[in-house]
């Protein structure tokens, strides 16, 4: 199909802000209500608003006798000693907890209910790293909107997402939660996800508070080891790490979560520069800051605070408003104020921020507005939501190789061999941080292929290899067999007879995520061995790589002829991949995180600066005295922005609306894109700039549109 599209891009120096859609009269009214309520509150009640507790107890009935933990939480709720709960989910459960707080406490201040709604609630979407590969901001916003609709129908009012950490190190397991290595694209995606969660009006029962996390530098943990120290210079801090936080703060995000790590020697939740000077004062952030789970207490482990009392002091005075599960404020903040160590005005300001968001949510008008069981039954896991999940999933798939034009699979193919543990895995596609997605509820790749071909094509399956010896749990390590080849014979047998082989390799869901850092990010077990055996007996092998991070496996990339990178795609994974395999959808995804050739290259990213000796000059070939590895190329296996299609596109020369651009000005770039191939397709048009001579060094490339 030959079609010309005229595209215009605006090159921006800063990310566009989402309009807050806030009426000044309403804002003034809310501020007046906050002040009036604050004047009525005792010190104990003020401190209570700054505590968040986990609801690891059943509140749908009487608090069980003998459960001391539950009894303490119930008593705190009745006294107004809790401002927010997390991990209480469901319209009925949140109603009961809200009732304890509102109908028993002196002032009846309602609770906010928080939860990690990261990439879907009941209907699960692609992991954020995968979703970012769509480069489709409308699709990403729709993903967050569906998640908000489902989560709020289950009583939740607050999500601890989006994670906006810019990540360069795939050894760090939490890259699966982010949008990759680029601050510009990461900022646009952060704003889209924030808009999807919060909408334009937080009083709308289909919207919820969003959280920009982790502030700041968490993804730069040394060696990719989770919770490790972070030491970065101001150039990296201001140009790479902070832009998504600044943009979301200025756009009106409801909350910011600080990070577990220290930043240049100061724990982030005790850093006044980050939280007070930068976020609240310079950027005008109007929401509140919450710590991560138990992280105020962890300032003791950092060697920054001598005990929990001092940790509470460091946190509140540096601008950390709410304490998540450290009990530092609960146990020590009242004492710190009464002793004069902490000014009551600091506490009042933190409480104002929390109350302000409760008024914005409309909780004082109706504290039970999110606890509607009929709405919950009607809005979870609907056909419409699954259709949206399938659409977003197919847009997130990246075609890395199609050398033999095996894809899309044509009608002449009558025998397909589907091989690999992951092909018949209904849990792994959900990824880590899967909200309330039910284990084993995803459409597997095998099911997706069977749904696509019906009885017209013979589909055979062999596991080939065993991925793990357990199903895994969120907070426990997985165990992998090293030498299980017992399934090879059956896999080879069906591969020999097939017209096309679909071979899955990659990672289980819980191999990435929090606490899942790895020094070896190659394929586990004998997956690569099976790939080599299968390609000996069939030339038409389509490799489907399912993983939560870039996988370092050069032999796989170099020896395969057809390769799809599908990440963990969520509820509709199998159907979405089948849409691409059989040409119902032409893949348009592009990588947002470079795939290294070797682990020793890490970090490898596209927007690096030029070295003083970047490459050998004329006559210097063979010289070692330039910035390179003696045993590997500098470039990644696949770079940021890479992804091919079933068709081809031709670009005209770009035209600029002007030859210069001043501070805070824009230049429009126009280009004609022609589809010169045989398939309909969509193209992600990327625009990069380079400032060749500047007062401070700039990257060799910077994405700007």
Segments from the language model and where they lie:
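Glycoside hydrolase catalytic-domain context in secreted enzymes
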Residues: 21-705
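Bacterial Sec-dependent N-terminal signal peptides
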Residues: 1-23
């Amino acid at each position: 199909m030959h079609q010309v599209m005229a595209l215009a891009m605006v090159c921006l120096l800063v990310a566009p802000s989402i309009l807050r859609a806030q009426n000044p009269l309403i804002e003034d009214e809310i501020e007046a209500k906050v002040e009036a309520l604050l004047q009525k509150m005792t010190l104990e009640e003020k401190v209570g608003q700054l505590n968040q507790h986990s609801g690891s107890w059943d509140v749908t009935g009487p608090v069980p006798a003998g459960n001391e933990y539950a009894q303490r939480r119930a008593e705190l709720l009745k006294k107004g000693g809790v401002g927010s709960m997390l991990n209480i989910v469901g319209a009925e459960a949140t109603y009961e907890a809200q009732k304890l707080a509102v109908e028993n406490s002196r002032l009846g201040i309602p609770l906010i209910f928080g939860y990690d709604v990261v990439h879907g609630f009941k209907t699960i979407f692609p992991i954020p790293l995968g979703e970012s590969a769509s480069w489709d901001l409308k699709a990403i916003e729709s993903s967050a909107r569906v998640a908000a609709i489902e989560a709020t129908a289950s009583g939740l009012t607050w999500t601890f997402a989006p994670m906006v950490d810019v990540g360069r190190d795939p050894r760090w397991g939490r890259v699966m939660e982010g949008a990759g290595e680029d601050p510009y694209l990461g900022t646009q995606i952060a704003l889209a996800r924030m808009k999807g969660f919060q909408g334009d009006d937080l009083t709308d029962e289909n919207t919820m508070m969003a959280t920009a996390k982790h502030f700041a530098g968490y993804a730069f943990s040394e060696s990719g080891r989770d919770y490790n120290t972070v030491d970065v210079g101001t150039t990296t801090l201001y140009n790479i790490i902070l832009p998504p936080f600044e943009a979301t703060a200025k756009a009106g995000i409801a909350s910011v979560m600080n990070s577990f790590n220290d930043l240049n020697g100061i724990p982030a939740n005790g850093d006044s520069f980050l939280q007070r000077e930068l976020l609240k004062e310079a950027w005008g952030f109007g929401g509140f800051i919450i710590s991560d789970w138990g992280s105020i207490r962890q300032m003791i482990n950092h060697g920054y605070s001598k005990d929990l009392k001092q940790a509470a002091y460091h946190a509140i005075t540096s601008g950390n408003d709410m304490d998540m599960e450290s009990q530092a404020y609960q146990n020590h903040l009242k004492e710190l104020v009464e002793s004069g160590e902490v000014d009551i005005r600091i506490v009042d300001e933190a409480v104002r921020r929390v109350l302000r968001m409760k008024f914005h949510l409309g909780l004082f008008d109706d504290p039970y507005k999110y606890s509607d069981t009929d709405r919950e039954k009607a809005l979870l896991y609907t056909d419409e939501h699954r259709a949206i999940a399938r659409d977003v999933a197919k847009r997130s798939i990246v075609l890395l190789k199609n050398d033999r034009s095996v894809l899309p699979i044509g009608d002449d193919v009558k025998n397909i061999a589907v091989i690999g543990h992951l092909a018949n895995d209904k849990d792994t596609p959900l990824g880590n941080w899967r909200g309330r997605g039910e284990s084993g509820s995803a459409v597997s790749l095998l099911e997706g292929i069977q749904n696509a071909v019906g009885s017209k094509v013979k589909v055979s399956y062999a596991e080939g290899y065993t991925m793990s010896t357990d199903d895994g749990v969120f907070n426990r390590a997985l165990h992998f067999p090293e030498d299980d080849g017992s399934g090879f014979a059956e896999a080879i047998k069906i591969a020999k007879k097939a017209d096309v082989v679909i071979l899955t390799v990659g990672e289980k869901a819980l191999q990435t995520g929090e606490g899942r850092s790895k020094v070896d990010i190659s394929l586990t077990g004998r997956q690569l061995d099976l790939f080599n055996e299968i390609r000996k007996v069939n030339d038409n092998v389509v490799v489907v790589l399912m993983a939560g991070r870039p996988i370092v496996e050069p032999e796989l990339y170099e020896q395969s002829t057809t390769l799809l990178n599908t990440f963990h795609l969520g509820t509709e994974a199998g159907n979405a991949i089948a849409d691409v395999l059989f040409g119902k959808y032409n893949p348009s995804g592009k990588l947002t995180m470079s795939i290294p050739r070797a682990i020793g290259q890490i970090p490898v990213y596209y927007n690096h600066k030029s070295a003083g000796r970047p490459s050998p000059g004329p006559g210097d070939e063979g010289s070692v005295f330039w910035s390179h590895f003696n045993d590997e190329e500098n470039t990644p296996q696949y770079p940021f922005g890479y992804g091919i299609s079933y068709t081809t596109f031709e670009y005209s020369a770009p035209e600029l609306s002007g030859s210069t651009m001043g501070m805070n000005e824009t230049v429009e770039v126009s280009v004609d894109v022609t589809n010169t191939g045989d398939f309909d397709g969509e193209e992600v048009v990327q625009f990069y700039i380079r400032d060749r001579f500047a007062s401070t060094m700039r990257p060799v490339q910077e994405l700007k549109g």
